[in-house]
């Protein structure tokens, strides 16, 4: 699963890109769990577009909102502004139709750089994001957004109609019965905790400030909730296919269940 509440902000949203995958074992042994192993994101089978969000002009700049529990103010003056989960963003405008932003963690480490270009007719925005990972590598994402309403310029409601990402690897293990450990190698992030709904803090050098709580409704399924500072930012459900070869992670923002993102992973 991808913590889109943390991630979408930098492409709106790419800089908080934290991919977490949960697993469930219950009373079964780790060897019997269908979640244990190495998983690779199948970009072609995944559905990553469809989300809507807005930029609203304010007396001092703009306010971003995902229409759910994520909202923050910023200006295009190059200064750092707080967003969520301990992240900051700085924006600059270059001409009438081009914007650049830089997302950082609480220690000032650059997480993502985002370049946005608005079409001449003001109807389409192309967004290119470069994400900087903890292992020293980078990856690029390209999004196409269409204006739903509003304008001119950045202001208005937008919908993502195309999202192009690079694949990544997830490693899942079961250290003990009723516990899951997930590792994201390129982010050097670990999520380890119980499957009884108890919140577990995300660990890692550039991890966001937040917790994920898991529950197990079935042997091949779990539900999860990501929260930061007491506010639920994202929810989801992960399911392993009956043949054990595919993991499907469906996620959404609270109150926006009609805009679900679907990530499909192949077992390696």
What are these regions (language model features)?
Residues 2-17:
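Bacterial N-terminal signal peptides that target proteins for export
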Residues 7-10, 22, 124:
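A detector of low-complexity, intrinsically disordered, Ser/Thr/Gly/Pro/Ala-rich segments
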Residues 15-21, 25:
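Hydrophobic helical h-region of N-terminal Sec-dependent signal peptides
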Residues 25-31:
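Sec/Tat signal peptide C-region and signal peptidase I cleavage site
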Residues 31-268:
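Hydrophobic small-molecule pocket/channel-lining residues, especially in calycin-type beta-barrels
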């Amino acid at each position: 699963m991808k913590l889109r509440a943390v991630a979408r902000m930098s492409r709106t949203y790419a800089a908080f890109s934290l991919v977490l995958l949960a697993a469930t074992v219950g009373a079964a042994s780790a060897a019997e769990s269908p979640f244990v192993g190495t998983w690779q994101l199948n970009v072609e089978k995944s559905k990553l577009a469809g989300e809507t969000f807005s930029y609203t002009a304010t007396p001092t700049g703009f306010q971003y909102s995902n229409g759910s529990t994520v909202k923050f103010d910023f200006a295009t003056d190059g200064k750092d502004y707080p967003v969520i989960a301990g992240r900051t963003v700085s924006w600059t405008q270059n001409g009438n139709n081009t914007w650049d932003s830089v997302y950082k963690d609480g220690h000032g480490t650059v997480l993502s750089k985002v370049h946005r270009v608005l079409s001449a007719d003001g109807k389409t925005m192309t967004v290119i994001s470069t994400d900087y990972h903890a292992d020293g590598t980078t990856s690029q994402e390209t999004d196409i957004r269409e204006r739903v309403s509003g304008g001119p310029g950045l202001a208005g409601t937008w919908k993502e109609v195309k999202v192009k990402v690079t694949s990544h690897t997830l490693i899942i293990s079961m250290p003990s019965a009723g516990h899951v450990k997930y590792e994201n190698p390129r982010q050097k992030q670990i999520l380890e905790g119980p499957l009884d709904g108890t919140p577990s803090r995300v660990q890692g050098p550039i991890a966001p400030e937040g917790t994920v709580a898991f529950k197990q409704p079935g042997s091949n399924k779990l539900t999860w909730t990501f929260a930061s500072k007491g506010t639920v930012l994202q929810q989801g459900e992960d399911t392993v296919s009956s043949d054990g070869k595919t993991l499907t992670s469906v996620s959404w923002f609270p109150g926006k269940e009609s805009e679900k993102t679907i990530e499909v992973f192949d077992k390696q």
